[in-house]
Amino acid sequence: MIIYYLKLEGFNMKIKYVAEPFRIKMVEPIKMLTREERELKIAEAKYNTFNLRGEDVYIDLLTDSGTNAMSDDQWAGVMKGDEAYAGGKSYFKLVDAVKDIFGYKFVQPVHQGRAAEKVLFGLLLGEGKYSISNMHFDTTRAHVELSGARAIDCVVPEASDPTVRIPFKGNMDVEKLEKLIKEHGADKIGVVVMTITNNSAGGQPVSIENMKETAEICKKYNIRLCIDAARYAENAYFIKQREPGYENKSIKEIIKEIFSYADIFTMSAKKDAIVNMGGLLGIKEDEELFQLCKGRTISFEGFITYGGLSGRDLESLAIGLYEGIDENYLRYRIGQMEYLAARLDEAGIAYQSPVGGHGVFVDAKSMFPHIPYNEFPGQVLAVELYKEAGIRTCEIGSYMLGNDPDTGEQLKADFEFTRLAIARRVYTQAHIDIMADALITIKERANTVKGYRITWEPPILRHFQASLEPLK
């Protein structure tokens, strides 16, 4: 095996990877089923990894959302949470943290990111309207469509080629954005959404320059710019590492600049705020919009000072916002992805490159060139990883994309990924090596693997519930 060495500030020696910047205080046992048991379990789950029981999973890479390990400070905060129905001090601690980090005047906590979308998009969108994004994630797209509007993706073309290595592959295609605005009419564009990092494109970051250019277009046509901020801290770290002029800026300074270009943000705090539950809706200065959002929050989430969360959730979220922007933590976090990517490079396994923030997106189309898009190569690899090593992942491709709402025909995604989303502060380097070894083993027998067909699907967000069966 080739060993990749790196230099790290504080060490004179060369090291193979960035070690965990924490000590482990509490552990949870996990079990490994036999191969025969795993094959039975995935068949019982109708070959949908979302249907597997957590106790039957050895390494859970289904999502990095809400699966993180909280710190001792966060757990101490749980005990200090103020459970007052209205005006609890944990709410004000959270509001102060959001204002300090993001610089927004108005803050509304919600139970998770999709709740923020539900509150907001019902006000900005509707029949005949459009939402344009560098890429909508699945729940964002669903809330756009539930409002009666249409979602249009507008990512740079390089994002569709996993082999192209550019530093900011999640960027908005600004020329296409302006063309779409002119084509549909500015009055029909309810919102422009910038997803950072760009999850569906492989956790790829967006540059400050691209944020600026997008904001200028939105201002020119009087369209609100909203940041989907689920992985904003990872995006800021990539800017510090990759964008000229930002190498000496702090993560917090970069975050302030990113958010200065937008009007609104929605955030699933279950990612970069390192909590198990929570979300945020931030509005920079539009008090009228904030008042409308508060009314919808009371209807959907609960009173405005708890937003569907307990006081202990609010307290741990306020602490986690600061822990998630710590540069030592982010260096380790991204280092895990870079180490796994280096193992895959050595084995000749293609992935969305350069590696993104919260996981490695393996190019299943490249691994299974004989399996067409409508037999879901990304889902095939997800099933094979569970069979091989008890690893649960999910597909990001045609299976998740679903059917054309007008024709009912299966849509073809630009890429067929299997996402290995790594939870924060949960898995060690040994687990990362198991992930790599499992993928290498599957690659060796890839030509024997067959596709799947859907036997049942719901009308919206089918990948969460659909049933599949292997093709003979």
From Swiss-Prot:
Domain of life, per lineage? Bacteria
Name the needed cofactors: pyridoxal 5'-phosphate
InterPro entries recorded: ArAA_b-elim_lyase/Thr_aldolase, Beta-eliminating_lyase, PyrdxlP-dep_Trfase, PyrdxlP-dep_Trfase_major, PyrdxlP-dep_Trfase_small, TNase, Tryptophanase_CS
Listed pathway(s): Amino-acid degradation; L-tryptophan degradation via pyruvate pathway; indole and pyruvate from L-tryptophan: step 1/1
Membrane-spanning parts: none
EC class: lyase
**EC identifiers of the protein:** 4.1.99.1
Q: Which PROSITE patterns match?
A: BETA_ELIM_LYASE
> What is stated as this protein's family in its record?
Belongs to the beta-eliminating lyase family.
**What is the name listed in the Swiss-Prot or TrEMBL entry for this protein?**
Tryptophanase
Biological source species: Clostridium tetani (strain Massachusetts / E88)
The gene name reads tnaA
